């Protein structure tokens, strides 16, 4: 089952088992250049107080998120203010024209961290997803909690091995992102739609294997759940690192 399809059901379950707890998310940028993280709350919930911010190379900052919550984080790169005064990014742009994304998601390709936070020390679900393509190496690590609580990441720079058909190039011709085959080729066998709309009929493709071989912990395509979804109990905090 796709991660997004779980959001509504999980939030309903969590609301019926309500307690109050907050998770601290610490963001660290180990990339050589500035990254502009974006945040998006799913399931129709209210957006976080910060929906986007600047994070200089070597810098760290934190956000507090109250459970239950489900949503995603990502990094934007190659950002600037254009001649009309609008803030734009070459990868991960959310189209708001501002550093804050204001409830808008990332334009692919973008490496995503996806989470569902439980209340009352329940079970959190989380993953790193490349279903929408790749732009930056990223890692998510729980701190505290109980159970498996394993970190997950895509630490490799897939841009260096991205197939030509999937490459997203910057103004200087360098590869700054790697599109999913679904986005680049728009075929049902890559998008897991139509006759390919089940796990049995939509196996990994040569393109998704490029992502999986580089980042075995991350979702490489829609039906990668078994190896790419992680869990943690007990209300952990989380660290998100760009270019770990």
UniProtKB/Swiss-Prot annotation:
This is Thaumatin-like protein 1. N-glycosylated. Residues 1-22 form the signal peptide. GO terms for cellular component: extracellular region. InterPro entries: Osmotin/thaumatin-like_sf, Thaumatin, Thaumatin_CS. The lineage of its organism: Eukaryota, Viridiplantae, Streptophyta, Embryophyta, Tracheophyta. The keyword Glycoprotein applies. Style. It comes from Pyrus pyrifolia. Belongs to the thaumatin family. Keywords: Disulfide bond, Glycoprotein, Secreted, Signal. Glycans are attached at residue 150. It is found in: Secreted. CDD domains: TLP-PA. Its main location: secreted. It comes from the Eukaryota. Disulfide bonds join 31-243, 79-89, 94-101, 149-232, 154-215, 162-178, 182-191, 192-202.
């Amino acid at each position: 089952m796709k991660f997004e399809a779980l959001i509504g059901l999980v939030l309903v379950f969590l609301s019926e088992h309500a307690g109050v707890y907050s998770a601290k998310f610490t963001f660290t940028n180990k990339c050589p250049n500035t990254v502009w993280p974006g945040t998006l709350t799913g399931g129709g919930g209210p957006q976080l107080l910060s929906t986007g911010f600047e994070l200089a190379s070597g810098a760290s900052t934190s956000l507090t998120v109250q459970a239950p919550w489900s949503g995603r984080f990502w990094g934007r790169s190659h950002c600037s203010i254009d001649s009309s005064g609008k803030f734009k990014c070459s990868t991960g742009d959310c189209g708001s024209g501002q550093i804050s994304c204001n409830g808008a998601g990332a334009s692919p390709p973008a490496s995503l961290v996806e989470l569902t936070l439980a209340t009352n020390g329940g079970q959190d679900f989380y993953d790193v997803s490349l279903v929408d393509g790749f732009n930056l190496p990223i890692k998510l690590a729980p701190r505290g909690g109980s159970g498996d609580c394993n970190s997950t990441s895509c630490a490799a720079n897939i841009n260096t091995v991205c197939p030509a058909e999937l490459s997203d190039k910057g103004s200087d011709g360098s590869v700054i992102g790697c599109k999913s085959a679904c986005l680049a080729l728009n075929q049902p066998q890559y998008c897991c739609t139509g006759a390919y709309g089940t796990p049995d009929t939509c196996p990994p493709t040569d393109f998704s294997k490029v992502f999986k071989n580089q980042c075995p912990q991350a979702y490489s395509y829609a039906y990668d759940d078994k190896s790419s979804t992680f869990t943690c109990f007990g209300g952990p905090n989380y660290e998100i690192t760009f270019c770990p």
